[in-house]
């Protein structure tokens, strides 16, 4: 995007590429660093698979940053020096004039944006108060059983078979790896210390699913068909829940502090904090609103928290790009009205924002549709978070920063009524 902007200014291809990389470096560095901060928080407060996810996230971000900044530039420069890239345009006939020279008055729509955001918050608070959350065994305590059958089975049918036996307790059945293997989760009598509880539960599983077990005996079922067992006691679940809470809170604080240190402007920090908090709360509220309605598991577990923290990092990426452009435009036109500066920054980064969000959403949608039930909940949270995070950058983070600046008179002199209506 930066190179295309330089080309539109009439610069040569070589100069455009050099200046594009130069001007984009700070935004790319900031956005990647915020995601790495999220990764380290996950690494500290996560357990088991979440630590693995955090490690993968950090390594992939570092690799992506290195290739985006250095490797791609080396390729472009090598191609230009050999005369093979002389006809590069970085556009197609469709994208050439797409979203160029837009003049959307984002700040003029800030009251509408605030109203919609408040309405969403009210709905989500109502859902959390009435329905609560469908907590997985990571947070509520419980047992997991991975069961392999001799033929493909449907999780919904297995769940219906087992409901009478586990009435009054949570029960979740999802497909993992293949159609003949499911994971059954329940918090049935998790607080009891009776030594016979495990045998009682496995007996209930065997009796409840007898119609799909064929001629398998109880011994064959427990020894061969149950692939794995996992128990999370109430005290461990409480520890995981506390760790997840602090992971989210510390991520929000870390992002706000980094933005404050990077841009030296409290309004940017508050705007970022409000935006990512709104995004995270929207995801939590949506899971409260839709669990039991959508045909896949919407449990609140460690994977769900990982999705929220990843979305927080992603949302900050967009916000950092916009704030970096505001700082750049302000440096070029120090006496320009603050509303014009912010609207110009939002419009000039709109193509980049939408391209990044759309490409990410397409990948997540493919994973959501083609992936298994195990990651469907995670990808759904990510997909929804990308959409809400993009919208909150445009209609929550930046307008809040503007309102703080306008009210405290931290920047410029007097806003133009024409541009702030």
Predicted features by range, described:
Residues 33-42, 241-282, 286, 357-369:
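Internal alpha-helical transmembrane segments of multipass membrane proteins
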Residues 1-11, 28, 65-67, 309-330, ...:
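Short helical (or helix-break) motifs at transmembrane helix termini and adjacent helical loops
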Residues 412-421:
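Single conserved hydrophobic/aromatic residue that forms the stacking wall/gate
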Residues 1-16, 59, 73-92, 323, ...:
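Juxtamembrane helix-loop transition segments at the membrane interface in multi-pass membrane proteins
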